[in-house]
Design a protein with these regions (language model features):
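Alpha-helical transmembrane segments that form the membrane-embedded catalytic/substrate-binding core
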Residues: 110-118, 145, 149-168, 172-221
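Membrane-interface helix-boundary motifs at transmembrane edges
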Residues: 7-11, 41-45, 64-77, 132-137
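Alpha-helical transmembrane segments of multi-pass membrane proteins
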Residues: 60-63, 85-90, 150-157, 161
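Membrane-proximal helix-loop-helix units in multi-pass membrane proteins
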Residues: 92-147, 162, 166
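Membrane-interface helix caps and helix-loop-helix hairpins in membrane proteins
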Residues: 40-43, 69-72, 95-105
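Short, highly charged, low-complexity non-transmembrane loops/tails of multi-pass membrane proteins
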Residues: 231-255
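N-terminal membrane topogenic signal
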Residues: 5-23
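Cytoplasmic-side transmembrane-helix entry/capping segments in multi-pass membrane proteins
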Residues: 73-84, 107-110
Length: 255
């Protein structure tokens, strides 16, 4: 496949992916507004759900903003996977309410986030360690970087959820802390069904799912890298070449 053909294929796939994501997002917004107009939830819940729609758009834009700022290009499959994950987590989970309709939706996403963010870590790891001699040492170093990168992203996501719940505790329940609340006592303390707190259980189970997903993905990848180091190129980032302006012909050349 020629470079131009590859570029055309990439362009078509991205256009289709953007179109599908946009249709799902628009449908989710329309679905949310209709539910609000039917009186299924209050205005605060409408604002909360629409906020996640904005966040979904921002996350998709961030993928290509990173590529633009650092003059890199992620593998096409990774770009599409990141967009799909953003739509599934933020749009599907919140606008369409799949967190409530599908009991395991949250844990499924946290488990799948392990392999997804591991691939991002592998891409950055192969770039950072590109000058390291090939061999078992490099394969282990790249895999370790990807492992820590994935866990770090999972940790930061939990920090984000906690921050949102803390700043706006009335309408947000990202860490399911409201699920275990029975009532409030006269002394100001809360009466809960779970001594450890439902929020703590949700946070730790999310981190464990991310850990398990990361480990299950990276162990076979490490074995593959050790046997065939060239396979690391599957996750390699591409350097975007600067566009060079064509030199204007001199008067003599014009003649």
């Amino acid at each position: 496949m020629t470079h131009s053909a590859s570029a055309q294929t990439r362009k078509r796939v991205l256009i289709v992916s953007f179109t599908v994501c946009a249709l799902i997002l628009i449908g989710g917004i329309a679905f949310t507004v209709c539910m609000y107009l039917d009186g299924d939830f209050a205005r605060g819940e409408l604002v909360r759900r629409l906020w996640y729609a904005v966040l979904c758009i921002a996350m998709i834009a961030a993928i290509f903003l990173v590529e633009l700022l650092f003059r890199i290009r992620f593998p096409l499959a990774l770009e599409v996977s990141l967009m799909a994950f953003a739509v599934a987590a933020l749009c599907g989970g919140n606008l369409y309410g799949l967190y409530g309709y599908v009991p395991f939706w949250d844990k499924l996403l946290h488990t799948l986030s392990g392999p997804l963010f591991s691939i991002v870590g592998l891409s950055f790891g192969t770039l950072i360690l590109k000058d390291m001699p090939e061999g078992v040492g490099k394969a282990a170093a790249v895999a370790l970087f990807a492992f820590l990168f994935s866990l770090a992203v999972g940790y930061l996501w939990e920090v984000f959820e906690y921050s949102v719940d803390s700043l706006m505790p009335g309408g947000y329940n990202n860490q399911r802390w409201q699920n275990g609340v029975v009532g409030q006592l006269e002394n100001g303390n809360w009466e809960v069904t779970e001594p450890r707190g439902s929020g703590l259980i949700d946070t730790m189970s999310d981190l464990i799912c991310n850990f398990v997903g990361t480990l299950c993905f990276l162990v076979p990848v490490l074995v593959l890298f050790v046997k065939k180091p060239s396979r690391a190129e599957l996750f390699a980032l591409e350097r975007r070449q600067k566009r060079t302006k064509k030199a204007r012909p001199s008067p003599e050349e014009r003649e």
